[in-house]
Amino acid sequence: MSAPTVRRAAGAADRAFIERCGVESLGSSVSPLREAPMEALRTNFLRLLEIVHSRSHAILVAAEGELRLGFALVVFDLPDEVTGLSQAFLAYMAVEVGQRGHGIGSLLLDACEEEARRHETPYLGLMVTEGNAAAQRLYERAGYRTERRLLGKKL
């Protein structure tokens, strides 16, 4: 595989890929404490795509030629819930199942960081599900550290 490129501002032609790839990767994003039918997860993901369009954001696509390999959705200018300082937030990232383990996630994460710097945002936050070990390794290798823990209990 030749080196993939990252395109900023994914266009309308990328929408079907983003929806399909995002929905297919939902299984690794769901906590076992928050089981939900796949259709509910799909609906919520599509709602997320609509919500971010009302904020300053970028959708980045990793591609090799016309072949789309993964995408990341980063939102800017969000106030931190504790300090109130401006932050960027990686709202979603997905890589095609057959393309995982080839550096696509790292490429997209680097691009998100570059976009955050371009927006003069000194902090990029994200959340990762406890059971998603591959994503945790990716983020930790890139220098991300646990700041808080979100605890939950199934009732």
Q: Residue locations for each model-derived region?
A:
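A conserved beta-turn-beta hairpin within the catalytic core of GNAT-like acetyltransferases
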Residues: 78-90, 100, 147
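Conserved GNAT-fold acetyl-CoA-binding loop/helix
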Residues: 23-48
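Conserved beta-strand in the GNAT
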Residues: 61, 67-76, 89, 94
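Conserved acetyl-CoA-binding loop-helix of GNAT-fold acetyltransferases
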Residues: 92-95, 101-114, 118, 137-141
